[in-house]
Amino acid sequence: RGRRHRNWRPDLIVLDDIENDENVNTPEQRRKLKSWFEKAVSKAGDTYTDIMYIGTILHYDSLLNNVLQNPRYKAKKYRAVISEAVNTKLWDEWESIYTNLFDEDHEAHARKFYEEHEADMLLGTEVLWEEKLSYYDLMEVKISEGEASFNSELQNDPIDPDNATFNP
């Protein structure tokens, strides 16, 4: 079942975003993907073959989440927000301003509020890649795209607070 080029087997296998909303949707689809990975991918190389799996956790029983928890693999899970703001009251106030659609300049007013309270609002925060997405940018995404998308796509934590039995 191993793959080879002449007498050589691959020394690196790269899996990039192989899961999508459809193939993690049902237990049967997740089982098939896991079986393919265990029987085909992990057996395609040799003892020296490295497997690099890059992706977003779309379901708690997804292949990626299972690989992350498998002691056979060295795994690293990244989150856009490493630590949240300490001062949640200011962020709640900012959110009220940002989401006030009766105010035509709500985004500018929210930005002004943030700039006036920036030091207090950023207290305790840490983000993965500040140059790409600041904490402010990430909070805009969280509000505009919703917590379910934010948690799954940027935090690698597929929690949808609207469908959770207990709100985290």
Model regions and ranges:
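Non-catalytic, compositionally simple segments
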Residues: 21-168
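Phosphate-binding/switch loop-helix module in NTP-utilizing enzymes
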Residues: 1-24
